[in-house]
């Protein structure tokens, strides 16, 4: 059974389930796995037993962090699901999942509608042009309102919703849905928890009389919306002919795949209602690998594309590296073209290294199902890849191609971490290396002065989880400092011709190097934070020593003169110097360059730069004054305020150092009703009081 499904790509769906935290994404995925017959007992997130949440912390915290890929079958079709996290600290996970999906199910909370995080993920999906269907979940919740949620899709996302289902009953009386395409009612009666069938069986009935009129109105709207966007149906519609269910379905499919509109369904995953029709919609309306455009290589001089076809040369993208308890490195890949047996040799074209596939699996959460080969259009987990990291292309040796990779933001928050014993030190290095392979937004460095290891990430929760994983998976016992902000230093003033002579004449070979440098402030851009110019004439410093001066300056820039933070925004010009035939060396000039920079930058009015975050707060009207007052007290600049269906959306730029612990303060000020999201915006000069405080701390005063 499984083999024949694998070959016919029209029956394959690679989908993601995307949502705000707590909209019920993992629960929805669990139900899908249950109804498609993979899991025998439904895992509840409340019990910490969901099959997709396979890291210990995910099960404890009830949130999903890593996108586990899972394969299941529904009505003769194969659905590969990638579970994505909705928490903003894990943008990298969402980005990488969207990059390899063909379609997605956006899950919304029926009471809250579109929330900030859903909006962030929705925009990321727009960037990768991923077709979506929407599932309005939690229809059993008090205050759930299907029509309000549909309205938020228009107001907040600016998308065109296509309502293809209506709820029957609401809150505690929610018992099923009206299918507007086939004009019938699907009901799940008396099946609240307790019943063994777990919602696996439902009744197909005529539409209840009291809802008939509403159903007819929405059916009419549905046909009008589809006909307006589809020429073939428009003619039938105007000539008054009956549009068949099959015609309507294929038109909805075309419009969904092209991203023109988004079908909307509803249900309650937790109460086991409405999940099977959503699976039918995944098959009916979301694209197969054959419906999406071919992938292109990034080499502009040699444009190439690969079709989702087994006869094409092999190409695949690695989108995640995970550490598996038994197999070690597990690389998740999406195969775009061609086919290869397990054990084949291929080339990693991004890094120009040869690689060999070991065993190949199709995954069910964290259980593996070995398969003999990989073929186009599918998602696999493979072992045996040594050099491949997230975003790398793997391809046939004779037909190289590099596929578009993914972009990852720089980390903005750091904590010092100290192993408790010598044995922990070794385990810590291994843990850091493994975790950095998995997560491109996790960076680490050694502070040269204190010798401490510093780990950096995208937010407080992100680092908490990484430290926790070191403890659990690698048994590292370590003391963790309080979160620190990743400051930078720069200069404000030009220093002309600063001279420094390095000489040492005590027994044995001496050392001699003289350099004269000019430092100027340089505007920092994404690509450029430092510029070195050599204007030495007449061989006053031999050519072979010039790069050493540059290297010395770079060394010194790693530890700023003000508070030991990396220096950026420097243009250094080597103006002149002197050397000695015997005593000069590359080392001597490196030391001279480094010392000259340190002295000159002290005179160049050094200053501190702090990371500024772009913060968005969504709050009910009545708390707006408090929220704005609080942001102002955190040195925030309010950029804009907008109304968005009963709530105010405040956009502000706030220094990261003022945002620690913000979530708790915001909850207490707004009785837990406001939510916020923040992303890194850029660096800006820190005020004097902040600079003095940071400098004092750095000097241990």
UniProtKB/Swiss-Prot annotation:
Gene3D superfamilies: 3.30.230.10, 3.30.70.240, Elongation Factor G (Translational Gtpase), domain 3, P-loop containing nucleotide triphosphate hydrolases, Translation factors. Disulfide bonds: none annotated. InterPro entries: EF-G-like_DII (IPR053905), EFG_II (IPR041095), EFG_III (IPR009022), EFG_III/V (IPR035647), EFG_IV (IPR047872), EFG_V (IPR035649), EFG_V-like (IPR000640), G_TR_CS (IPR031157). One of its GO terms (biological process) is ribosome disassembly. SUPFAM superfamilies: EF-G C-terminal domain-like, P-loop containing nucleoside triphosphate hydrolases, Ribosomal protein S5 domain 2-like, Translation proteins. GTP binds at residues 19-26, 83-87, 137-140. GO terms for cellular component: cytoplasm. Keywords: Cytoplasm, Elongation factor, GTP-binding, Nucleotide-binding, Protein biosynthesis. The keyword Hydrolase does not apply. The keyword Cytoplasm applies. One of its GO terms (molecular function) is GTP binding. Catalyzes the GTP-dependent ribosomal translocation step during translation elongation. During this step, the ribosome changes from the pre-translocational (PRE) to the post-translocational (POST) state as the newly formed A-site-bound peptidyl-tRNA and P-site-bound deacylated tRNA move to the P and E sites, respectively. Catalyzes the coordinated movement of the two tRNA molecules, the mRNA and conformational changes in the ribosome. Belongs to the TRAFAC class translation factor GTPase superfamily. Classic translation factor GTPase family. EF-G/EF-2 subfamily. This is Elongation factor G. It comes from Tropheryma whipplei (strain TW08/27). The lineage of its organism: Bacteria, Bacillati, Actinomycetota, Actinomycetes, Micrococcales. The gene is fusA.
């Amino acid at each position: 059974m499984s083999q024949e499904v694998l070959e016919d790509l029209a029956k394959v769906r690679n989908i993601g389930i995307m949502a705000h935290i707590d909209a019920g994404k993992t629960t929805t995925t669990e139900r899908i796995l249950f109804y498609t017959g993979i899991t025998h007992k439904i895992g509840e997130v409340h019990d910490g037993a969901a099959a997709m949440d396979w890291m210990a912390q995910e099960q404890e915290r009830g949130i999903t962090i890593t996108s586990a890929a899972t394969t299941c079958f529904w009505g003769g079709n194969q659905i590969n699901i990638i579970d994505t996290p909705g928490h903003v600290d894990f943008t990298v996970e969402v980005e990488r999942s969207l990059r390899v999906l063909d379609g997605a199910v956006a899950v919304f909370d029926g009471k809250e509608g579109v929330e900030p995080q859903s909006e962030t993920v929705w925009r990321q999906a727009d960037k990768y042009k991923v077709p979506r269907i929407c599932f309005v979940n939690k229809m059993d919740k008090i205050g759930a309102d299907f029509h309000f949620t549909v309205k938020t899709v228009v107001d907040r996302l600016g998308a065109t919703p296509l309502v293809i289902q209506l709820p029957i009953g609401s809150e505690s009386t929610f018992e099923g849905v009206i299918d507007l395409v086939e004009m019938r009612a699907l009901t799940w009666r008396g099946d609240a928890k307790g019943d063994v069938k777990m919602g696996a069986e439902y009744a197909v009935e005529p539409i209840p009389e009291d809802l008939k009129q509403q159903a007819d109105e929405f059916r009419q709207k549905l046909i009008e919306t589809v006909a307006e966007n589809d020429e073939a149906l428009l003619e039938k519609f105007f000539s008054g002919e009956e549009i068949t269910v099959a015609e309507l379905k294929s038109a909805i499919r075309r419009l969904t795949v092209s991203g023109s509109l988004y079908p909307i369904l509803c249900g309650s995953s937790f109460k086991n209602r409405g999940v099977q029709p959503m699976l039918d919609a995944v098959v009916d309306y979301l694209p197969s690998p054959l419906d999406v455009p071919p992938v292109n290589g990034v080499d502009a001089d040699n444009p190439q594309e690969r079709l989702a076809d087994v006869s094409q040369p092999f190409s695949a993208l690695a989108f995640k590296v995970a550490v598996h308890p038994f197999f070690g490195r597990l690389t998740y890949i999406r195969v775009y073209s061609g086919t290869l047996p397990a054990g084949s040799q291929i080339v990693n074209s991004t890094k120009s290294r040869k690689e060999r596939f070991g065993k190949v699996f199709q995954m069910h959460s964290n259980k593996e199902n070995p398969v003999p080969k990989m073929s186009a259009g599918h998602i696999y987990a493979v072992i045996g890849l040594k050099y491949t990291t997230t975003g790398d292309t793997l391809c046939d040796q004779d037909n190289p191609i590099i596929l578009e990779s993914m972009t990852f933001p720089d980390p903005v928050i750091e904590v010092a971490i100290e192993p408790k014993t010598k044995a922990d030190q070794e385990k810590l290095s291994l843990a850091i290396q493994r975790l950095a392979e998995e997560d491109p937004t996790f960076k680490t460095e050694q502070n040269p002065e204190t010798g401490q290891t510093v780990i950096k990430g995208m937010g407080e929760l992100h680092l908490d989880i990484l430290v926790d994983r070191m403890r659990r998976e690698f048994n590292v016992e370590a003391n963790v400092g309080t979160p620190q902000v990743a400051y930078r230093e720069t200069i404000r003033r030009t220093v002309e011709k600063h001279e420094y002579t390095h000489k040492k004449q005590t027994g044995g070979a001496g050392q001699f190097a003289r350099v004269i440098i000019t430092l100027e402030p340089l505007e920092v851009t994404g690509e450029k934070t430092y510029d070195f110019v050599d204007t030495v004439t007449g061989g006053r410093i031999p050519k072979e020593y010039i790069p050493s001066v540059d290297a010395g300056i770079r060394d010194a820039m790693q530890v700023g003169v003000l508070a030991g933070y990396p220096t950026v925004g420097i243009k250094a010009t080597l103006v002149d110097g002197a050397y000695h035939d015997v005593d000069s060396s590359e080392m001597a000039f490196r030391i001279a360059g480094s010392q000259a920079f340190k002295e000159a930058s002290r005179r160049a009015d050094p200053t501190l730069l702090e990371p500024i975050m772009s913060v968005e707060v969504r709050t009910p009207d009545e708390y707006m004054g408090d929220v704005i007052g609080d942001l102002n007290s955190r040195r925030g600049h309010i950029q804009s305020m907008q109304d968005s269906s009963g709530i105010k959306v405040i956009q502000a730029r706030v220094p990261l150092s003022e945002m620690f612990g913000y979530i708790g303060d915001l909850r207490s000020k707004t009785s837990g009703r406001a939510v916020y999201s923040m992303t890194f915006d850029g660096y800006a000069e820190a005020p004097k009081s902040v600079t003095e405080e940071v400098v004092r701390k750095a000097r241990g005063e």
